[in-house]
């Protein structure tokens, strides 16, 4: 803008005021534009994007749009250049009628993030409406007797424009009789009068035709005309006169129908009929006034006949005419101004727009959820509206502009606590009494994967019988996820690990959807007592969340193993055992002992022995111990007894159903003077096919002696090497038993240790020597694994002979096959979390004092097949805590290990040997210097003797 220097200080002041005005508009947060009405389509209004500080490139992605409901189609924004333009015809008179100020209020909304801008477009009036009179002509009756300067009212024109465009000037066509007199009222309206300038003469001029022209102040000027038809009357020369030219009345918009508005008073100086006045509305009155009011023609009372509404029309201007009954009648006019007063009869209105739903439960605070617009048709305090939100919700209302509010997030959301919020927004005006309105906003909370699947308990215990069919269902795990939809879709899987040397997936599987756990193969209690593993539950969210649960599957024992007899094998099968018994032995003499084991556990492995009746019901002088299996005489044998007895011993376990095995014992009575070897040979000769066994035993003795000699040399060589080479730490650490379950809760060890069978000679294998090989722990370090084989090899690379401390004694080899004598039941717990099982216990008061006795394991964590044997009378004291027993039996196997050297001067009790009829004399041991070799040879000799006995 360029100012002339002539302007001086005035131009500077104008520039300063313009700058201050622009700064105020920017600070108010609203843009202001102005356009003339009737602008063509596409007319430029303003660069709204540039003025709002928005980039043109972000208009389309942010869905920049006009959101006003009332005037949305009048103006539009070009998203390509950000220009606000005229979209359809704008008529100021249609928008604002007679209002002096006319503006279009627009709401411009941009998403991501949500922003609201307010634009006010002022509509400028143009002179597009000419002045208009109500009719094409006005008829005026004027008596000829009227005096000069008499005035006669005429109706003016109306212009729909405002301002200068509605400022009317009137001109009257030239006339000798009348001139135009214009008066301006305080309501900015003009009253027109015809003033008589010359006496009328009806006979000379009965009618006059004048042209009244109204011209507005617009550019270009517009005009309107009306023809005035003046009829000159005779006689009645006094018109009615009102006591007031203008009547002013105020009515509440709630005024009831029939209420008296005002009473008009008019008088006529004439007498008689010429003085009677009749009231009526002017002929040019609007239809709206005729529907709202009525006037009594005789009394002049104006009454209300319809409801008023301040919001529709705030004031009424009523033209009332008083006409006398003279001939011709004379009339006069007055004006009644009715102002309608506002009453708080309109409740506020709420509109919820631009909902940003659903909202994520992890949405940040102050996130805009919705826009709320309030309005009230009342005015003043009755139209002032305040908004509020229901309490105790994580939302709040923020006033962004007059009558505009934003619903924003005030605190953190949790869909699992509440997934939908039903909000109530209340708008209340300032009237008395105040009116209010409510709007409900349903806010749905979208789920976020913030909850992992949870199991009902951290660990489950399952009991499964062994020998289950493959693929059987053993348990169902279930996890619940508090999230929704995909975030709550749980899938299950195994946490893979190894069970021994096999993968966990070889034993069990879990269905991914249902959580059912299946056993893929038959489980064997004798191989696996406890299977502990974890099942993982994972949801389908992004990122996925998961948790684990531990399953402890206890495999319950079934009676699926029959008792197995431990006896010498002939031709690969268990044959009959032949025993020689001297005649004339006393009652209770132990003839033989039937040895059997059962691979099951508990009552399924508790064996009892029964002697089957002889053929023909003959009585036999023998009996068998119910739980020991020892065959003894029931009386003193004499010459009358048979020389040979065939005894059938039935071995039966206590399972359901019970399984059995039968042992055959051939007892031959010989003279007491015969040597045991001769008796043995005689029995073998009687047996027939057993004669060849004697020769085998002879060769076996020779082989054992050779092996013993080689063992002594090996030990000497090994000792020399050990003295010359520093020992390697960890090379001789015994391995730990292989664990079925490797969890931190504790585990049960295998009841069946790994066994290695060693045969002393070629031919049919015999269980003469059982070497214990403990399973090595998988956690051994590399040096232990590398050095372990060196402990078992000599310098030549050949396997070394076993240590003499790990051999059997003759008594142990004989006693290891004996059954346990059980009298009462005790309780053995399988360790933490394991099942409680009833176990038989051992009584020290056995009826056979010479027989072997056992004590059951007591306390948690002891293997179910581990039993401590006691031999000989007197029931020796058991080893206390921290003491090592002299002998122990390998669980699940017939091997008994001697871990201590026998005392050199102690005698071996005869009850430690099972001679099956042969007496073994007591031998004294040499001193400790020569004790090892002598004892080793003696034990080998005893083994040979036992083999020959068998």
UniProtKB/Swiss-Prot annotation:
Instruction: Kindly report every residue range on the membrane side named Cytoplasmic.
Output: 719-950
User: Can you name this protein?
Assistant: Protocadherin alpha-1
Query: Which regions does the record annotate with the repeat PXXP?
Result: 734-737, 799-802, 832-835, 873-876, 891-894
InterPro entries the UniProt entry points to: Cadherin-like_dom (IPR002126), Cadherin-like_sf (IPR015919), Cadherin_CBD (IPR031904), Cadherin_CS (IPR020894), Cadherin_N (IPR013164), Protocadherin/Cadherin-CA (IPR050174)
* Stretch list, region 5 X 4 AA repeats of P-X-X-P: 734-894
Gene Ontology CC terms, in alphabetical order: endoplasmic reticulum; extracellular region; plasma membrane
> What keywords are assigned to this protein?
Calcium, Cell adhesion, Cell membrane, Glycoprotein, Membrane, Repeat, Secreted, Signal, Transmembrane, Transmembrane helix
Sugar-modified residues: 257, 265, 548
Basic and acidic residues bias located where?
909-923
Topology: which residues are Extracellular?
30-697
Q: List residues traversing the bilayer.
A: 698-718
In residue numbers, the region (Disordered) covers: 752-808, 828-856, 871-890, 900-950
Q: Name any one Pfam family assigned in the record.
A: Cadherin_tail
Q: What is the purpose of this protein? A: Potential calcium-dependent cell-adhesion protein. May be involved in the establishment and maintenance of specific neuronal connections in the brain.
- Which interval of the chain is the signal sequence? 1-29
Question: Which species does this protein come from?
Answer: Homo sapiens
PROSITE patterns in UniProt: CADHERIN_1, CADHERIN_2
User: What GO annotations for molecular function exist for this entry?
Assistant: calcium ion binding
Q: Where is the Cadherin domain?
A: 30-133, 157-242, 243-350, 351-455, 456-565, 588-678
């Amino acid at each position: 803008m360029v100012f002339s220097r002539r302007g001086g200080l005035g131009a500077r002041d104008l520039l300063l005021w313009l700058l201050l005005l622009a700064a105020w508009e920017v600070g108010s947060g609203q843009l202001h534009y102005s356009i003339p009405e009737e602008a063509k389509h596409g007319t430029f209004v303003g660069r709204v994007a540039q003025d709002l500080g928005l980039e043109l490139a972000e208009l389309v992605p942010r869905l920049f749009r006009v959101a006003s409901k009332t005037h949305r189609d009048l103006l539009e924004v070009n998203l390509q250049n950000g220009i606000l333009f005229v979209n359809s015809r704008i008529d100021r008179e249609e928008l604002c009628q007679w209002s002096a100020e006319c503006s279009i209020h627009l709401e411009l909304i941009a998403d991501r993030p949500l922003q609201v801008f307010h634009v006010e477009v002022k509509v400028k009036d143009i002179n597009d409406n000419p002045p208009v009179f109500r009719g094409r002509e006005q008829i005026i009756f004027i008596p000829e007797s009227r005096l000069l300067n008499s005035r006669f009212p005429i109706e003016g024109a109306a212009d729909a424009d405002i301002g200068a465009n509605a400022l009317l000037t009137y001109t009257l066509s030239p006339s000798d009789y009348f001139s135009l007199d214009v008066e301006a009222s305080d309501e900015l309206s003009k009253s027109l009068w015809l003033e008589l300038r010359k006496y009328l003469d009806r006979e000379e001029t009965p009618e006059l035709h004048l042209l009244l022209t109204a011209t507005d102040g617009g550019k270009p000027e517009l005009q309107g005309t009306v023809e005035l038809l003046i009829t000159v009357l005779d006689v009645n020369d006094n018109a009615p006169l009102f006591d007031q030219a203008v009547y002013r009345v105020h009515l509440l918009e709630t005024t009831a129908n029939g209420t008296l508005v005002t009473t008009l008073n008019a008088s006529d100086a004439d007498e008689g009929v010429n003085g009677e006045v009749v009231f009526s509305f002017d002929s040019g009155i609007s239809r709206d006034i005729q529907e709202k009011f009525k006037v009594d023609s005789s009394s002049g009372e104006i009454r209300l006949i319809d409801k008023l509404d301040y919001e529709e029309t705030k004031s009424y201007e009523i033209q009332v005419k008083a006409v006398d009954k003279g001939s011709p009648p004379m009339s006069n006019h007055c004006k009644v101004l009715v102002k309608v007063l506002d009453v708080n009869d309109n409740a506020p209105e709420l509109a919820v727009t631009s909902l940003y739903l659903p909202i994520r439960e992890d949405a940040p605070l102050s996130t805009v959820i919705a826009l709320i617009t309030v309005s009230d048709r009342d005015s003043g305090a009755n139209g002032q509206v305040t908004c509020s939100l229901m309490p105790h919700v994580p939302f709040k209302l923020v006033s962004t502009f007059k009558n505009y509010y934003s619903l924003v997030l005030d605190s953190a959301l949790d869909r699992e606590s509440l997934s939908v919020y039903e909000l109530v927004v209340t708008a209340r005006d300032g009237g008395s009494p105040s009116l209010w309105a409510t709007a409900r906003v349903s806010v749905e909370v979208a789920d976020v994967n913030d909850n992992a699947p949870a199991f009902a308990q951290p660990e489950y215990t399952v009991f499964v019988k062994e020998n289950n069919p493959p693929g059987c269902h053993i348990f169902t795990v279930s996890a619940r996820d508090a999230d929704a939809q995909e975030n709550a879709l749980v899938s299950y899987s195994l946490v893979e690990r190894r069970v021994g040397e096999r993968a966990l997936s070889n034993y069990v599987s879990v269905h991914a959807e249902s959580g059912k756990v299946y056993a893929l193969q038959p489980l064997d209690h004798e191989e696996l007592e406890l299977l502990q593993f974890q099942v993982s539950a994972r949801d389908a969210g992004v990122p996925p969340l998961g948790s684990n649960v531990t399953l402890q599957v206890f495999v319950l024992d079934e009676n699926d193993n029959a008792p197995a007899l431990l006896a010498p094998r002939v031709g690969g099968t268990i044959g009959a055992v032949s025993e020689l018994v001297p005649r004339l032995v006393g009652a209770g003499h132990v003839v033989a002992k039937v040895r059997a084991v059962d691979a099951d556990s508990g009552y399924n492995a508790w064996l009892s022995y029964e002697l089957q009746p002889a053929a023909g019901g003959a009585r036999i002088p023998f009996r068998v111990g119910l739980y020991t299996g020892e065959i003894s005489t029931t009386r003193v044998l004499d010459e009358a007894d048979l020389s040979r007895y065939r005894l059938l011993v039935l071995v039966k376990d206590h399972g359901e159903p019970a399984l059995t095995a039968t042992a055959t014992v051939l007892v031959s009575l010989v003279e007491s003077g015969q040597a045991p070897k001769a008796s043995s040979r005689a029995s073998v000769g009687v047996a027939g096919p057993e004669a060849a066994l004697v020769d085998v035993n002879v060769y076996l003795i020779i082989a054992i002696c050779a092996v013993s000699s080689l063992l002594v040399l090996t030990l000497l060589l090994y000792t020399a090497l050990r003295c010359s080479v520093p020992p390697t730490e960890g090379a001789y650490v015994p391995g730990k038993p292989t664990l079925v379950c490797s969890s931190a809760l504790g585990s049960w060890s295998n009841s069946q240790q790994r066994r290695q069978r060693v045969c002393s000679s070629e031919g049919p294998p015999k269980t003469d020597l059982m070497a214990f090989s403990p399973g090595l722990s998988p956690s051994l370090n590399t040096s232990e694994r590398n050095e372990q084989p060196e402990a078992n090899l000599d310098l030549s690379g050949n396997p070394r002979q076993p240590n003499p401390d790990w051999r059997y004694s003759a008594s142990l080899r004989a006693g290891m096959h004996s059954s346990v004598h059980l009298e009462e039941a005790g309780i053995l717990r399988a360790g933490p979390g394991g099942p409680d099982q009833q176990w038989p216990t051992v009584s020290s008061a056995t009826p056979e004092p010479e027989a072997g006795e056992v004590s059951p394991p007591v306390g948690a964590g002891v293997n179910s097949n581990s039993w401590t044997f006691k031999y000989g009378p007197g029931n020796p004291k058991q080893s206390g805590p921290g003491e090592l027993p002299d002998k122990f039996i390998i669980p699940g196997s017939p091997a008994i290990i001697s871990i201590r050297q026998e005392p050199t001067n102690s005698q071996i009790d005869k009850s430690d040997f099972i001679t099956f009829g042969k007496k073994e004399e007591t031998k004294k041991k040499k001193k400790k210097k020569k004790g090892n070799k002598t004892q080793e040879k003696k034990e080998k000799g005893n083994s040979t003797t036992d083999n020959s006995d068998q």
